[in-house]
Amino acid sequence: MKTEMAEVQPVLILAIETSCDETSVAVVKDGCEVLSNIISSQIETHRAFGGVVPEVASRKHVEVMTLVIEQALAEAGVHPQQLTAVAVTQGPGLVGALLVGVVAAKSLALAWNKPLIGTHHIAGHIYANRLVAELKYPNMTLVVSGGHTELVSMEQEGVFRIIGRTRDDAVGEAYDKVARSLGFPYPGGPHVDRLAREAAEAVALPRVWLEPGSYDFSFSGLKSAVLNVVNQSKMKGLEPNVAGIARGFQESVVEVLVEKAIRAVRSTGSRQLLLCGGVAANGGLRAALISRCEAEKIELIIPPPVYCTDNAAMIGAAAYVKWQHSGGTPLDMVADPGFSLEEWSVPVASIE
């Protein structure tokens, strides 16, 4: 007598991301196939203020949340009852912005009788790489965003160990501050990147390596050096060499990031180097990493720009890992603006 194998049902996760100034909802299948990824950006709103205003960001999330959820389900062609779970960014991020997403996700989980998966924002950025490639372990991730600059080692799936982090400004924050000093509007990073690659020569600026062997980063001194060059030019009645400063700044940042990332890969025996975060869209950084990894014969994974900036598809990818190893999150979970990546790691016992 033949026994028919039960058909394996796909894991469909509706994910919500509201940690800063993008309202995003996605439907992700089995942690790697994006069925929809709707993003409502607030850049134009915050540009007038020269940066993200937390209260304004929260209000904008509330205004568009329902519409973005409806669009994500419609584009995916998925009915709520087909979903396996609802995932949401629990932290880190702006507390008011996080709360909007968490409340929405809890409401949907209750209304649809689905499990809830609280997800770490940086784990999402890291697992954005799984949307484009199969991950091999151990691996090393260079996280570069507006709020974070870290080197994260993963010896096993979903188990994170931070071996290096910024001691002051995150790299994205440094880009925005330097861009402002050079007269560019918010967000300034893309302007600096474009000008740096067009400049004929670079203004000499320092590289901050910190102690020998350290994987930590520091960008406040470099930022101060840029401001000093700009102010000295103005005091002499001269126009600052904006293009040269942009190139000098970017070369300094990129050299330190690339060198420490490559060293981290070698010292940990990592099989891949992953790049993630909003600054991963920076053309100068991508080109330098690609060139260096080709020379060093290191497998490099970089997501396309749409998965580098904040988006819900990456949250769905990370939530899938959590779901496979740990299951859901209690409905009384709270938004946590200081959420620890290492604490969010899946239990090692679940992998063995």
Map each language-model feature to its residues.
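Conserved phosphate-binding catalytic cores of ATP/NTP-utilizing and phosphoryl-transfer enzymes
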Residues: 2-11, 119-140, 318
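N-terminal beta-alpha supersecondary unit
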Residues: 8-92, 125, 245
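Short beta-strand scaffold segments in enzyme catalytic cores
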Residues: 23-28, 141, 149-153
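Glycine-rich phosphate-binding loop and adjoining helix at the ATP-binding site
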Residues: 82-128, 133
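Conserved phosphate-binding/catalytic loops in two-lobed NTP-binding clefts
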Residues: 118-119, 273, 290-314
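Glycine-rich phosphate-binding loop plus the immediately following alpha-helix
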Residues: 123, 156-198, 223-224, 228-232
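A contiguous, well-structured pocket-lining segment that forms one wall/lid of small-molecule binding clefts
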Residues: 194-273, 282-296, 323-326, 343-352
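Glycine-rich phosphate-binding/hydrolytic loop that grips phosphoryl groups
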Residues: 303-341
